[in-house]
Amino acid sequence: MDELHASLTHLFADTFGRAVIGDKEQMQRVEDTCRANLEDNVRDPELRAKLTPDYQAACKRLIISPGFYQAIQKPNAELVTQPIDRVEAGGVRTRDGRLHGMDVLVLATGFDGHSFMRPMDLIGRDGVDLKDVWAETTQAHRSISLPGFPNYFMLVGPNSPIGNFSLIDISERQLSYIMQLIELWRGGEVNEISARQDAADRFNASIKAAMGNTVWVTGCQSWYLDKHGNPAMWPFTFDKFCADMSAPDLEEYELVS
């Protein structure tokens, strides 16, 4: 089973994982698969048109559901694509002036995908507050460490490949990387470990330079993007992520005995 899981993980990484970071041939396959699934399951051309996005596949997070197309075609379901203008006592009024009466309104508007450790208070060296460090944009070194915050490590931090690969797999690889750093402290070799600012700057510059090739910057609005339109995603291959997480380069860290 482990071998099967590893094989399927690598297959996914070599198809979808490459599609989202600029492999046009793989992206075409993803889009063709999504389109064929829609056409096979929704016969009404008007509804099918409403269900067809006006942005590239995977620009927003793809949702895999075995029953959504069947549910949306039931007599008691209606797909409304008009923007919401306001919520009134009797229901929701859309921008075309139509009032959609309802008994219950469920606000499934998502979450803050860029909060990470916030709103928890985290104070680093010299009293620096994480909220201030991340006031404009969220960055970390290799997604797990922050300059000026010794002995602090996180899983699934900024620019982790949450939109490319299995969240479980990437968390396990990040944890293995972090544990190698913690073992230095447990062995008494160091008292403090934190990312060097220059190393973090180089890492984040490489992320920014590669992001222009990805699907996340092709024009849609999603929770992948921060307020400046920067995706907190991983713009490289699965193999590179695995290599980066195999062992820490101690030259990238400030080690205090």
State the predicted function of each range.
Residues 1-257:
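N-terminal FAD-binding dinucleotide-binding subdomain shared by FAD-dependent oxidases/monooxygenases
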